[in-house]
Amino acid sequence: MEVNILAFIATVLFILVPTAFLLIIYVKTVSQND
């Protein structure tokens, strides 16, 4: 079973980018509430 490296990277980025974006918003919100 071949592993398509580009497809793997694209999938990882597709998951990590929105996750990082939500984490940044969460941290900013928590910091403002302090």
Curated annotation (Swiss-Prot):
Signal peptide: none
Membrane-spanning intervals of the chain: 5-25
GO BP term, pick one: photosynthesis, light reaction
Gene Ontology CC, one term: chloroplast thylakoid membrane
Keyword Ligase found: no
InterPro entries, alphabetized: PSII_PsbM (IPR007826), PSII_PsbM_sf (IPR037269)
Origin superkingdom: Eukaryota
Intracellular or extracellular location(s): Plastid, Chloroplast thylakoid membrane
Membrane topology, as annotated: Single-pass membrane protein
Keyword Hydrolase: no
Keyword field: Chloroplast, Membrane, Photosynthesis, Photosystem II, Plastid, Reaction center, Thylakoid, Transmembrane, Transmembrane helix
A Pfam family assignment: PsbM
Subcellular location, principal: plastid
HAMAP family to which the protein is assigned, alphabetical: PSII_PsbM
Similarity field: Belongs to the PsbM family.
Function: One of the components of the core complex of photosystem II (PSII). PSII is a light-driven water:plastoquinone oxidoreductase that uses light energy to abstract electrons from H(2)O, generating O(2) and a proton gradient subsequently used for ATP formation. It consists of a core antenna complex that captures photons, and an electron transfer chain that converts photonic excitation into a charge separation. This subunit is found at the monomer-monomer interface.
NCBIfam families on file: PS_II_psbM
Quaternary organization: PSII is composed of 1 copy each of membrane proteins PsbA, PsbB, PsbC, PsbD, PsbE, PsbF, PsbH, PsbI, PsbJ, PsbK, PsbL, PsbM, PsbT, PsbX, PsbY, PsbZ, Psb30/Ycf12, at least 3 peripheral proteins of the oxygen-evolving complex and a large number of cofactors. It forms dimeric complexes.
Protein's name in the database: Photosystem II reaction center protein M
